[in-house]
Curated annotation (Swiss-Prot):
Membrane-crossing segments per the record: 27-47, 72-92, 109-129, 139-159, 168-188, 192-212, 223-243, 300-320, 339-359, 375-395, 409-429
The protein's role, per its UniProt record: Na(+)/H(+) antiporter that extrudes sodium in exchange for external protons.
Name of the encoding gene: nhaA
Key word Transcription present: no
Membrane topology: Multi-pass membrane protein
Keyword vocabulary terms for this entry: Antiport, Cell inner membrane, Cell membrane, Ion transport, Membrane, Sodium, Sodium transport, Transmembrane, Transmembrane helix, Transport
Protein name in UniProt: Na(+)/H(+) antiporter NhaA
Originating species: Herminiimonas arsenicoxydans
Length: 621
């Protein structure tokens, strides 16, 4: 019995590990490679007829005057893939609302590199095909796009060990890339336009905009309008990918507001005190109100898109029958080499060189920690076109035509070349230029110094937790109650250190006030007191708090603007920059920056893992 139980437990653990891996970007990329190989093997096996017959199977419905019939291949490309492009639109809206595109310098750099990363590959393709005097110029759109998910997954496999900042840069870049690529699909590769369905589609977009203006927080009205938009777009003759992108752009996104979180907490307290169906529904609605409908839809669609929709698309589009001399024919075709050169060389030079020149000219700035080698490595990986490329090939040539099959071979070969080139550039950058990471620093610098740092708990405690705080930050541990949970769990086993990272309007003066209180031995009472009064942090409020706590007010006022206190706060600011802390709260467990969630349960689990010596988060050596 024990052996059997152990076997079942081991199998369960293996399944859980596989499921966890598939949820990562690298896992999704590996799944896509596997599905692509399956499609190629199936299309070249004795069962190849079944493969092609499956995707040409007619599927449709009649509902009163509405009639929609397409083969299965079109249902995938014009139906399922709309969700993929809708997801891209959601991400673009998030980046503009509270992401990296709010930074004008980064947005300008992404726009410049994104545009040239679309234009140059297209020019390379046209040049090669035109010089060869070959047909196939209409397929230039196959080289303009980047498969964001595939590219980021490949980056996780072949890129630097820590590449968070490079990932942000590439994601910002592909936002522009994807927007332009989808616009090209909608404008260049659409069929004959029908006016009435087009007007209905435009009215649907206006409806989405109006819903956003009214701050509608429920997802259902948006989803219903998007469904109408899709139907109208399919009937209009415009490719549905453009509708998906446009719809995603119109779904409102905004940063989570503190008052929404507080309201949800009160609703949960009501449920805790009097559990009922009504109070449970109120909690559910309260939680939904606290997060933008954009982020909720994105979270709901992200995994199904990565693990189901895109793999199905790959299965439907990557199956090329290379028997009968197709490979020899493809490698002798200007279309194949136009696709390869456009995606591999065009993306590398269009993104890499343009980024370098733009930075040198002061037109933009790279994220901290990202070097030139990392930029070119990421530019090389941007040559993984796959999803957008295969979609445009189907629209331009048809997947079963000779030109379509040759272009598809070019896309698949370019994926291999782009991956190998990116891997090589990352290796050279690490060995020659020391670019072993492309991320913010991960190690606390300088280490905790009991003579300088503010420490709560025994100085020789087994565990150390450092938090960078801003007294106006609504999510720091003392503001949310996380610290109380941590102290209750670890007691004297935990040494807690606070450093300043003021970035809110009242943050600097509040930080100086805490140091003025520290000069009178009252740092921790001050911190506990002021974090409950974040709504009132003007100078006169802080002086009033000093009086309430029994401090020497005259000395407090003198210290508030003293050079020594200012220098003490600036020391912590310099430490934050050197340690990769750029927002509050930022936690360091045993001198290593914590990434991801920072709720009390997560921080407790990481501290316990450190105590057991099983923490796996990577840190540069």
């Amino acid at each position: 019995m024990p052996a059997s139980s152990f076997g079942e437990s081991s199998a369960h653990i293996r399944r859980r590990r596989v499921a966890h891996y598939l949820r990562t970007e690298s896992g999704a990329a590996v799944l896509l490679v596997i599905v692509t190989v399956v499609a190629l093997v199936w299309a070249n096996s004795p069962l190849s007829n079944a493969y092609f017959e499956l995707w040409h199977l007619d599927v449709g419905f009649n509902f009163g005057p509405l009639r929609l019939h397409m083969d299965l291949h079109h249902w995938v490309n014009d139906g399922l893939m709309v969700v993929f492009f809708f997801l891209i639109g959601l991400e673009v809206r998030q980046e503009f609302a509270h992401g990296s595109l709010r930074d004008r310098s980064r947005a300008r750099l992404a726009l410049i590199a994104g545009v040239t990363g679309v234009v140059l590959p297209a020019l390379v393709y046209v040049l090669i095909v035109k010089l060869a005097g070959s047909e196939g110029l209409h397929g230039w759109g196959a080289v303009v796009g980047t498969d964001t998910a595939f590219m980021l997954g490949t980056l996780a496999i072949v890129g630097p060990r820590l590449s968070g900042q490079l990932r942000v840069f590439l994601l910002t870049l592909t936002v522009v890339d994807d927007f332009l690529a989808v616009s090209i699909i909608g404008i260049v590769y659409s069929e004959e336009i029908r006016i009435v369905p087009l007007l209905i589609a435009l009215a649907s977009l206006v409806g989405l905009w109006l819903l956003g203006r009214t701050r509608q927080w429920r997802a259902t009205p948006y989803v219903l309008i998007v469904i109408v938009l899709w139907f109208a777009t399919v009937y209009s003759g415009i490719h549905a990918s453009l509708a998906g992108m446009a719809a995603g752009l119109l779904i409102p996104a905004y940063a989570t507001q503190r008052h929404g979180v507080v309201a949800a907490r009160q609703l949960f307290r009501d449920f805790w005190q009097s559990p009922s169906a009504a109070s449970a529904r109120a909690v559910d609605c309260g939680l939904s109100r606290g997060i933008s409908v954009n982020e909720r839809l994105h979270e709901f669609l992200r995994l199904p898109t990565a693990l189901l929709i895109v793999p199905i698309f790959a299965l439907a589009n990557a199956g090329v029958d290379v028997r009968g001399g197709l490979l020899a024919e493809a490698f002798g075709s200007p279309v194949t080499w136009g696709v390869i050169a456009g995606l591999v060389l065009g993306k590398l030079l269009g993104i890499g060189l343009t980024t370098l020149v733009a930075v040198r000219l002061g037109l933009g700035r790279l994220p901290e920690g990202v070097g030139v080698g990392s930029v070119f490595g990421g530019a090389a990986l941007s040559g993984i076109g796959f999803t957008v490329s295969l979609l445009i090939i189907g629209l331009a040539f048809g997947t079963t035509s000779d030109l379509g099959r040759q272009a598809t071979v070019g896309v698949l070969v370019s994926m291999v070349f782009a991956t190998l080139l990116g891997w090589l550039i990352f290796k050279v950058a690490a060995q020659r230029w020391g670019e072993k990471t492309a991320d913010l620093p991960m190690v606390l610098e300088p280490p905790v110094d009991p003579e300088i740092d503010h420490i709560r708990g025994p100085e020789d405690a087994q565990l150390t937790l450092v938090e960078y705080v801003d007294f106006e930050c609504a999510y720091c541990a003392h503001a949310t109650g996380s610290w109380d949970d941590l102290r209750a769990h670890f007691g004297d086993d935990l040494r807690y250190v606070v450093r300043h990272l003021p970035h809110h309007p009242h943050g600097p003066i509040a930080a100086r006030a805490s140091e003025a209180a520290a000069n009178q031995g009252m740092f921790w009472p001050w911190l506990d007191f002021v974090f409950t009064r974040q709504h009132a942090l003007e100078r006169e409020h802080l002086i009033g708090y000093a009086a309430e706590l029994g401090l020497d007010v005259e000395r407090f006022i003198a210290d508030l603007d003293s050079p020594a206190v200012i220098e003490r706060v600036e020391r912590d600011l310099a430490s934050a920059v050197a340690s990769g802390a750029h927002a509050t709260p930022t936690f360091f467990v045993e001198g290593r920056r914590l990434r991801g969630s920072y709720d009390a349960r997560t921080v407790t689990a990481v501290l316990e893992a450190s105590r057991r010596g099983t923490r796996t988060q990577e840190v540069p050596s």
